[in-house]
Amino acid sequence: MENSLFKKSEKKVHRALRVRKVLRGSSLKPRLCVVKTNKHIYVQLIDDSIGKTLASVSTMAKSNKASGLIKKNQDVAKTLGTQIAEIGKSLQVDRVVFDRGPFKYHGIIAMVADGAREGGLQF
C-alpha cells in the first residue's frame, strides 16, 4: 500500500514531465521557467540547447529583499515577471516559451506571465 503523500508528489512529477516534454528552449527562444515553493517564487530563463540558465530572479535575491519583495503574493509575482523581462531584453531575448511546471496557469503563475508580457516578452 502506497502512502497518499507519495502518490501526490509522484503525480506532481508526472505533471511537470508532461508539460516539459513538449517544451524546448533555444538561444533565440529560451524557456521561461516558474517555480513556486511554500515561501518563495523563482523565475528563470533557460537555454535547453546548451543546458544553461541565462538569467534568474527570485524573492530570495538581495535586491528584492532590500526593496521588500519577500512575500509570496500576486503583486510580487507580477514584479518578478517584469524584472525577468527587463533582464531578457538586455540579453536580446524577445520571445520565450512559458514553462509553468506542475502548477496550474492561475494565480501567482498567471501574474508572473502577465508581468513578463507587460515587460515586453512574447509567448
UniProtKB/Swiss-Prot annotation:
GO terms assigned for molecular function: 5S rRNA binding; structural constituent of ribosome
InterPro entries in UniProt: Ribosomal_uL18_bac-type (IPR004389), Ribosomal_uL18_bac/euk (IPR005484)
Highest taxon of source: Bacteria
Keywords tagged on the record: Ribonucleoprotein, Ribosomal protein, RNA-binding, rRNA-binding
Example GO BP: translation
Any one cellular-component term (Gene Ontology): cytosolic large ribosomal subunit
Pfam family, one: Ribosomal_L18p
Subunit structure: Part of the 50S ribosomal subunit; part of the 5S rRNA/L5/L18/L25 subcomplex. Contacts the 5S and 23S rRNAs.
Alphabetical list of PANTHER family matching this protein: 39S RIBOSOMAL PROTEIN L18, MITOCHONDRIAL (PTHR12899), LARGE RIBOSOMAL SUBUNIT PROTEIN UL18M (PTHR12899:SF3)
UniProt family annotation: Belongs to the universal ribosomal protein uL18 family.
Biological role stated in the UniProt entry: This is one of the proteins that bind and probably mediate the attachment of the 5S RNA into the large ribosomal subunit, where it forms part of the central protuberance.
HAMAP family recorded: Ribosomal_uL18_B
Protein name: Large ribosomal subunit protein uL18
